[in-house]
Amino acid sequence: MDRRYCTVDVFTDRMFGGNPLAVVLDAGQLSKAQMQVIAAEFNYAETTFVFPPRDPAHSAQVRIFTPRSEVPFAGHPNVGTAFVLARELVAAGKPVPERFEFEEAAGIVPLRVLCEDGVVVGAELQAPEALTRSAPVEIESTRLNSSHPRLSRMPSSA
């Protein structure tokens, strides 16, 4: 199985610094099991796999794997993947967009390509909103007014 890939050091300006990342370009027909084996072989914190987007309005579908499992989102893999894809466009003589939008398990991830004097130097992302779950106020209030022995010794907030 021949696949093109690139390794990159993210969050650094020197080789072998920062966070290493493997980016598998044109992941094609790789199965989840195959991606997992490849990620385990690289043994980096994360490895990304790039597929064509499902929606042509987006830049790519990106799947992120640790050596043990797939994850819905992670910061440095997105930054590194955007950097690699932008550099690939430059190498092919194609224009580099100001933004990429990756389709991921966590949702659409927008990234901005950073250029200095026409050279791709990095990328930055806006993380998707965190998923939170909070209890309704009535339930929280009930807990605070509980007759539990520990709570009964707490000073009243009123």
What kind of region is each of these model predictions?
Residues 16-24:
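Generic N-terminal amphipathic, Lys/Arg-enriched alpha-helix
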Residues 44-61:
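Conserved phosphate-donor
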Residues 12, 51-54, 113-117:
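Short, low-complexity Ser/Thr-rich regulatory SLiMs
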Residues 1-17:
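N-terminal, positively charged, Ser/Thr/Ala/Gly-biased leader segments
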